[in-house]
């Protein structure tokens, strides 16, 4: 995980997108490959911190099987941070897909993509005289990302109501 995370994120995505054939599945696989180290690090950190808690140590001392400890104590306490992190990764991945499609390295034109829609509005005449070509996809990207971030905030508040918000 550290090796993948040591490379700049956008550079790794661009190089991988340039190597593989542009398309929906290649973008999904590339973004999944680049994003998995963050999830792995989050899960590992949560499991290591939960391993030191009294309720897990109590189960170990009581002789509970490892499967019971993992599925009834550690997994339920690890799901919440993963869901919250997944919403931010989803928003970032949507921006990355739009950027790659805008550059022509993502989803190809017969398939609809917000990046492809923005790609059609690159000339200054289109930008100034035809805002209906680029304004709706641009606004939609902003609305989608902000909405997903609101969902992530709501999930964080739902899983941790005393999370410091006043």
Regions inferred by a protein language model and the residue ranges of each:
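Alpha-helical transmembrane segments of integral membrane proteins
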Residues: 1-166
């Amino acid at each position: 995980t550290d090796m993948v995370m040591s490379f700049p994120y956008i550079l790794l995505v661009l190089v991988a997108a340039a190597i593989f054939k542009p398309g929906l599945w290649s973008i999904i696989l590339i973004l999944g490959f680049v994003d998995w180290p963050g999830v792995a690090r989050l899960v590992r950190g949560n499991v290591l911190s939960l391993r030191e808690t009294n309720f897990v140590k109590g189960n170990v001392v009581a002789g509970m099987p490892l499967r019971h400890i993992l599925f009834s104590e550690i997994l339920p306490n690890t799901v919440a941070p993963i869901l919250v992190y997944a919403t931010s990764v989803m928003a970032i991945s949507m921006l990355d897909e739009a950027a790659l499609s805008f550059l022509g390295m993502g989803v190809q034109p017969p398939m609809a993509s917000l990046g492809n829609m923005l790609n059609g509005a690159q000339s200054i005449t289109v930008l100034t005289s035809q805002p209906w070509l680029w304004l709706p996809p641009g606004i939609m990207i902003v609305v989608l990302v902000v909405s997903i971030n609101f969902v992530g905030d709501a999930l964080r508040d739902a899983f941790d109501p005393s999370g410091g918000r006043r």
